[in-house]
């Protein structure tokens, strides 16, 4: 039983190291939108429009992709 626990802990550690959270989508929330097409002209400073958020605290705002910012959940 002890060997199984060590194996499981090692497997979980490996997964955490191989798949870090840094691969999550990162957004800068800008403007107001109803559809994702509305975000094309909203995103500034070379950011790519990603989607119009339709729920949660950022409802009705455009998610503009960037390198540092809020993680989209």
Swiss-Prot record:
Keyword Transcription regulation found: no
Compartment(s): Secreted
GO biological process: defense response to fungus; killing of cells of another organism
Pfam families: AtDEF-like
Signal peptide: 1-24
GO annotations of cellular component type: extracellular region
Annotated keywords: Antimicrobial, Disulfide bond, Fungicide, Plant defense, Secreted, Signal
Disulfide bonds listed in the record: 27-64, 33-52, 39-62, 43-63
Signal is among the record's keywords: yes
Similarity section: Belongs to the DEFL family.
Name under which the protein is recorded: Putative defensin-like protein 277
Organism: Arabidopsis thaliana
